[in-house]
């Protein structure tokens, strides 16, 4: 499971997901990518589930790059706890993903294998996504 080794602050504010992604919007490492079309918090479990789905379909051929990292702690209060008495304890980690962000990349497999692998990975994520090919490979 992905999570930071250590953080400066244990708890952070929720924040807002305004606008499109400014960074990480182009394919940098592989030939194929999975681009987010909606804003969302992607949990470390969802990232791991998508990674496993891709690895299983690609039969460990090729290489996968995970371009997002869950660096935001999400807190939760215990069940049946009254309001007040401070903020809850950190429960899990999320990555803040905005539209246009490349979340996963792959290389070393044929186009049809990559397309299906990313389709299976996209099913594990709570947002709409788009399969993209590096511009110099199209045509």
Curated annotation (Swiss-Prot):
GO terms for molecular function: rRNA binding; structural constituent of ribosome; tRNA binding. GO terms for cellular component: cytosolic large ribosomal subunit. The keyword Transferase does not apply. Signal peptide: none annotated. It comes from the Bacteria. One of its GO terms (biological process) is translation. This is Large ribosomal subunit protein uL16. HAMAP family: Ribosomal_uL16 (MF_01342). InterPro entries: Ribosomal_uL16, Ribosomal_uL16_bact-type, Ribosomal_uL16_CS, Ribosomal_uL16_dom, Ribosomal_uL16_sf. Gene3D superfamilies: Ribosomal protein L10e/L16. Binds 23S rRNA and is also seen to make contacts with the A and possibly P site tRNAs. Part of the 50S ribosomal subunit. Keywords: Ribonucleoprotein, Ribosomal protein, RNA-binding, rRNA-binding, tRNA-binding. Belongs to the universal ribosomal protein uL16 family.
């Amino acid at each position: 499971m992905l999570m930071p080794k250590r953080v400066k602050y244990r708890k952070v504010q929720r924040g807002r997901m305004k606008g499109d992604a400014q960074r990480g919007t182009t394919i940098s490492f592989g030939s194929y990518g999975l681009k987010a079309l909606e804003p969302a918090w992607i949990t470390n479990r969802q990232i791991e589930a998508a990674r496993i789905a891709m690895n299983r379909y690609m039969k460990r051929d090729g290489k996968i790059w995970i371009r997002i990292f869950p660096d935001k702690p999400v807190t939760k209060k215990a069940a049946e706890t009254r309001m007040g008495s401070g903020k809850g304890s950190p429960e899990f980690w999320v990555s803040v993903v905005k539209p246009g962000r490349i979340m996963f990349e792959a290389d070393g497999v044929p186009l049809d294998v990559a397309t299906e692998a990313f389709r299976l990975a996209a099913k594990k994520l709570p947002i709409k996504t788009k399969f993209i090919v590096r511009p110099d490979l199209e045509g």
